[in-house]
């Protein structure tokens, strides 16, 4: 269940957004808050159809517009079909949020937290879902954004790339690659009015992926963060809303930590 925020301003009226991996957790929260700000939203999902339909139902019940679309971000043709459907329904694509993440558990005792036990298969799965997924999604929406001469692309990463409090080798390596991707995209696509930024979240309290995280880890985050609390899913989604809006038109190519000041890169 997402966290409600009745105070979201109408920053995205008449905008059209795609949020990948939006059937639950952070993606669902982002989709709902973007919709609450006035955007029409495509809720992308891989396999959780019922959950995606519920996100859409929640958006519509709150007075927004949305539809769910099944597509694997690691398949370019599927993402191109998704983009075509969005344009057919809504006429444009203004915002892409690259949030999709392969199935993952933030378990500090897992074998992918040590260089001695992590396997290349762990890296491959994360690189395929995170980096390839983001590249495919950008390539799918790019023709429409170039035609419009505007667009916002927001890549979702983690503050673990700056401060590996827990050494999730596979996940952090893939998320680190998004920084380079973000900068290259911003450098090339700025001439078309397309802004590309990255938001690096802390360990969010709480999502499906972080449910195995111990209270000791959350307590450590709270005591070492200037704001003395872990970042909530709703707070992170509000940062996405800011970057998706016209309030951030002068910002591109940036990697911004959204973690209450825990990391200051």
What are these regions (language model features)?
Residues 138, 174, 182:
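Active-site helix of classical SDR
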Residues 39-54:
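Conserved glycine-rich Rossmann-like NAD(P)H-binding loop of the short-chain dehydrogenase/reductase
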Residues 143, 187-188, 249:
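Alpha-helical segment proximal to the catalytic Tyr-Lys
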Residues 116-135, 150, 154, 178:
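Catalytic Tyr-X3-Lys loop
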Residues 16, 23-24:
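Conserved glycine-rich cofactor-binding loop
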Residues 2-8, 163, 223, 227, ...:
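Short C-terminal tail/terminal secondary-structure segment
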Residues 80, 102-124, 167-170, 210-213:
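Conserved mid-core segment of classical short-chain dehydrogenase/reductases
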Residues 190, 195, 251-253:
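Short, small/polar-rich loop/turn modules that mediate ligand/substrate recognition or access, typified
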């Amino acid at each position: 269940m997402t966290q409600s925020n009745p105070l979201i301003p109408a920053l995205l009226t008449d905008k059209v957004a795609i949020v990948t991996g939006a059937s639950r957790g952070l993606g669902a929260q982002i989709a709902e808050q973007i919709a609450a700000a006035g955007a029409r939203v495509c809720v992308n999902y891989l396999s959780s159809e019922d959950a995606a339909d519920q996100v859409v139902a929640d958006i519509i019940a709150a007075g927004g517009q949305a539809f769910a679309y099944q597509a694997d971000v690691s398949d370019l043709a599927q993402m191109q079909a998704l983009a075509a459907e969005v344009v057919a329904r809504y006429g444009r694509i203004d915002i892409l949020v690259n949030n999709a993440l392969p199935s993952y558990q933030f378990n500090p005792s897992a074998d992918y937290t040590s260089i001695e036990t992590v396997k290349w298969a762990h890296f491959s799965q994360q690189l395929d879902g995170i980096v390839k997924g983001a590249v495919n999604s950008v390539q799918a929406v790019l023709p429409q954004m170039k035609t419009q001469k505007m667009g916002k692309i927001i890549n979702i990463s983690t503050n673990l790339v700056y401060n590996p409090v827990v050494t999730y080798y596979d996940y952090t390596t893939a998320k680190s690659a998004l920084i380079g991707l973000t900068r290259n995209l911003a450098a090339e696509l700025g001439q078309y009015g397309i802004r590309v930024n990255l938001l690096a979240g802390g360990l969010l309290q709480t999502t499906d992926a972080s449910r195995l995280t111990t209270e000791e880890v959350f307590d450590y985050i709270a005591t070492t963060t200037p704001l003395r609390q872990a970042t909530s899913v709703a707070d992170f989604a509000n940062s996405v809303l800011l970057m998706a809006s016209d309030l951030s038109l002068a910002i591109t190519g940036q990697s911004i930590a959204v973690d209450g000041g825990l990391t200051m890169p």
